[in-house]
Amino acid sequence: MVVRSWSELDFDNVCSNAKVFGFDLDNTLASSKQPMKPAMIERFCALLDHTVVALISGGGMAVVTSQVLDVLTPNARRGNLHVMPTSGSRYYRWDGTQWALVYAHDLSEATVAAVSESLERHARELGLWEQQVWGPRIENRGSQITFSALGQFAPVAAKQAWDRDNTKKQALVEAVKADLPHMRVRAGGYTSVDVSERGIDKAYAVRKLTQTLGIRADEMVFVGDRMTPTGNDYPAVEAGAIGVRVENPQDTVQLLDALLARFDTPAR
């Protein structure tokens, strides 16, 4: 699978062939748990005027709403936006008045309990159960359980400094995988590990969306910051989407500027 940096793209070719542009949220469109900044809002809404856009995030709908949906401009073309939180295990569309749920795949109570127990036990054993946290460490997102070592609302600077080489998260991933071989366990953001049913990841989101739209997977571009084979954006590429790597929202702003400069027709 080929993943290209945003700065290496042939933008003319991309704009000619892509029928939908998908985006990760945290550290792609916005800083973790923070709303999109005005420059991003302006460009994201402008992109909706030109093409179909998908938002595929590991976060739950509440976070997606606060970071993106609540800050869209009043005239944004919400009908062009496909919202797929928790890695596509939920799917929402705008019905003219609100974001309506199309489908949801939620974990059973027994599975939630088993995953939560494994995450806490191994985090403690590995010395990752930090004393200073900002919010809950373990969050049930319905179709995904997420462990956040510093809590759900930790400052971005603290999260960035916690596991710069990803060894802490990967150690927890491997330990939980051994307990729950039937589940998919992946490193998420700076401090997080996501656990979901096998097959319910961003590859699933890409397959569901491209089937819904009646397009090929390679007619979808997916932009994210976690594009290594162990990252939670990489499954989108494994499903056939064109992978584009950014390092932060500032890169994404420049990517959007380049895309918007090449669009000169109304939404398809």
Kindly label every feature range from the protein language model:
Residues 21-26, 85-88, 141, 148-152:
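Short loop/turn segments at strand-loop or loop-helix junctions that form parts
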Residues 35-134:
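Active-site phosphate-binding/coordination module
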